């Protein structure tokens, strides 16, 4: 085992604090509408320019092992805030730095770190309940757009686009962000249920110009296994021909005699038909077929359930108003499923999301939920250069996460004002002087975000704080974008409660760990052995050779 280097007490805390300051100072320049960019060198390609706190934090590694420990613990604050609320990473970093610096001063003055930690926890709990008490629910499209605009650093176009996407696919719908190949940023909405399987044979195409299959008022056969033989299919095909409606077959695969017969009948015009492979694999395929059955009001034909294909009646087929299939995707619009059954299926998937511990499973379940509940919207972010597109995509991601958080837990006035107001409402009492000092640490730290926003805008932070506190209205604050004071909610400067809350809770959690640190252990640097690099001995007899 390699030797370790151990430092204690004040030295351990000081070196960690240096790391905390290095990371926080790099991250906090990005805070607020007048925040600056940070340029990050990449091992290949152009440097990356960003205003996203967590992206900056993830790039920082320091040479000194103990400074690096402090920086990595602070990086955890930004990552945690990003995971919980998807935004507020810079605010969390600024708060953590403020709590750590104040806390370290008190510990150096001889106060008990554990009592300070208890005081910090009490104050944070009080602030969280104060934020929840004063939050306002987001209802209108305008409010959703305002939240998105603020988080995208004042880009109205992005805020509007997110509001439009949420209006179209609902709060449960999936909204994804991709890089576009064009200059413009655009919104693409897919209604209904879409899955990533295209037509099995191009002979099914009904619209040769667009190379797609379009079917109206469709019957849908959902089969779990592979269809190769024609015989079991004949009874249901005859019934479908008599009904004069198109048929879509979704099965594990369709090949051989079955596929040949379907294609021939389609080309002769006797049968409007198309076949696609079922989405997913293994157990997930079964679950997705069941989703399709609920959505279309049909039944999955499965040998496990004892249902044979030759015994299938028309009542077991699903229905949909419209189906569109291209070579990669199938979209089913307006399925004939009962609303009650769809809602039951949605709540079942929601419960599975709550119960699962795997991020991958959660993501897949959320996709299924969105396909059942709303639809899918894609925001394609454009720009003149690759660097610009990446920077804008970061901001759109932040804005999208902030908007979702706002819909979930409501909003408070932005610009750091909510935390500043809450700092004056902390009325918990510490059990002793050290706990009281812990509460005071949080009171002072809650001023840090608004001071930083003001300073990034080139205004004196102390003046801004005093001006705001002299006004009694909770929503009165400083708009750094326009450098005006006024009602921030009316100006559209708002923050989601979830973002502010998780920023504070994560900052306090990691800051408390740093304050209560009494020793640090790191791997000792390896000493270079003297005399290295020489030729090994024992080759003396080769001196006369001429190379």
Curated annotation (Swiss-Prot):
One of its GO terms (biological process) is protein refolding. Keywords: ATP-binding, Chaperone, Cytoplasm, Isomerase, Nucleotide-binding. It is an enzyme of class 5 (isomerase). InterPro entries: Chaperonin_Cpn60_CS (IPR018370), Cpn60/GroEL (IPR001844), Cpn60/GroEL/TCP-1 (IPR002423), GroEL-like_apical_dom_sf (IPR027409), GROEL-like_equatorial_sf (IPR027413), TCP-1-like_intermed_sf (IPR027410). The keyword Nucleotide-binding applies. Coiled coil: none annotated. Its main location: cytoplasm. Gene3D superfamilies: GroEL, GroEL-like equatorial domain, TCP-1-like chaperonin intermediate domain. Residues 526-547 are annotated as: Disordered. GO terms for molecular function: ATP binding; ATP-dependent protein folding chaperone; isomerase activity; unfolded protein binding. It catalyses: ATP + H2O + a folded polypeptide = ADP + phosphate + an unfolded polypeptide. GO terms for cellular component: cytoplasm. It holds the Pfam family Cpn60_TCP1. It is found in: Cytoplasm. Its EC number is 5.6.1.7. Residues 530-547 have a biased composition (Gly residues). ATP binds at residues 30-33, 51, 87-91, 415, 495. Forms a cylinder of 14 subunits composed of two heptameric rings stacked back-to-back. Interacts with the co-chaperonin GroES. Together with its co-chaperonin GroES, plays an essential role in assisting protein folding. The GroEL-GroES system forms a nano-cage that allows encapsulation of the non-native substrate proteins and provides a physical environment optimized to promote and accelerate protein folding. Belongs to the chaperonin (HSP60) family. This is Chaperonin GroEL. The lineage of its organism: Bacteria, Pseudomonadati, Pseudomonadota, Alphaproteobacteria, Hyphomonadales. The gene is groEL.
């Amino acid at each position: 085992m390699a030797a370790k280097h151990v430092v204690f007490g004040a030295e351990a805390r000081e070196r960690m604090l240096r790391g905390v300051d290095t990371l926080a100072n790099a991250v906090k320049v990005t805070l607020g509408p007048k925040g600056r960019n940070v340029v990050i060198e990449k091992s290949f390609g152009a440097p990356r320019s960003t205003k996203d706190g967590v992206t900056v934090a993830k790039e920082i590694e320091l040479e000194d092992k103990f400074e690096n420990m402090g920086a990595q613990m602070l990086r955890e604050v930004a990552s945690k805030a990003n995971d919980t609320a998807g935004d507020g990473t810079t605010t969390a970093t600024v708060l953590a730095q403020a709590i750590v610096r104040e806390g370290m001063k008190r510990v150096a003055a001889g106060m008990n770190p554990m009592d300070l930690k208890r005081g910090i926890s009490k104050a944070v709990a009080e602030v969280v309940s104060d934020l929840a008490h004063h939050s306002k629910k987001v209802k209108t499209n305008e409010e959703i757009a305002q939240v998105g605009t603020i988080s995208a650093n004042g880009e109205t176009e992005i805020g509007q686009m997110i509001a439009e996407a949420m209006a179209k696919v609902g709060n449960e719908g999936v909204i994804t962000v991709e890089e576009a190949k064009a200059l413009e940023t655009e919104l693409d909405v897919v209604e209904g249920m879409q899955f990533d399987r295209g037509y099995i044979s191009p002979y099914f195409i009904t619209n040769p110009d667009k190379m797609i299959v379009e079917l109206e008022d469709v019957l849908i056969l959902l089969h779990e296994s592979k269809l190769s033989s024609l015989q079991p299919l004949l009874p249901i095909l005859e019934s479908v021909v008599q009904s004069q409606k198109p048929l879509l077959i979704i099965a594990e695969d369709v090949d051989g005699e079955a596929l040949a017969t379907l294609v021939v009948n389609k080309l002769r015009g006797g049968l409007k038909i198309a076949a696609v492979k079922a989405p997913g694999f293994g157990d997930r395929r079964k679950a997705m077929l069941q989703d399709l059955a609920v959505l279309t009001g049909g039944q999955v034909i499965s040998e496990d359930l004892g249902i044979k294909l030759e015994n299938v009646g028309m009542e077991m087929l699903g229905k949909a108003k419209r189906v569109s299939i291209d070579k990669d995707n199938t979209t089913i619009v307006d399925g004939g499923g009962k609303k009650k059954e769809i809602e039951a299926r949605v709540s079942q998937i929601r419960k599975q999301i709550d119960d699962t511990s795997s991020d991958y499973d959660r993501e897949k379940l959320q996709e299924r939920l969105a396909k059942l509940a709303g639809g899918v919207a894609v925001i394609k972010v454009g720009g003149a250069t690759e660097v610009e597109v990446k920077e804008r995509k970061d901001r759109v991601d932040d804005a999208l996460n902030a908007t979702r958080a706002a819909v979930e837990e409501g909003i408070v006035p932005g610009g750091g004002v909510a935390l500043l107001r809450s700092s004056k409402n902390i009325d918990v009492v510490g059990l002793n002087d050290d706990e009281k000092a812990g509460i005071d640490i949080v009171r002072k730290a809650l001023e840090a975000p608004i001071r930083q926003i003001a300073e990034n805008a080139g205004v004196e932070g102390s003046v801004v704080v005093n001006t705001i506190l002299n006004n009694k209205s909770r929503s009165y604050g400083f708009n750094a974008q326009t450098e005006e004071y006024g009602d921030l909610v009316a100006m559209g400067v708002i923050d989601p409660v979830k973002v502010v809350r998780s920023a504070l809770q994560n900052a306090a959690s990691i800051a408390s760990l740093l304050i209560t640190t009494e020793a640090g252990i790191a791997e000792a640097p390896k000493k270079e052995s003297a005399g290295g690099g020489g030729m090994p001995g024992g080759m003396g007899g080769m001196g006369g050779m001429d190379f």
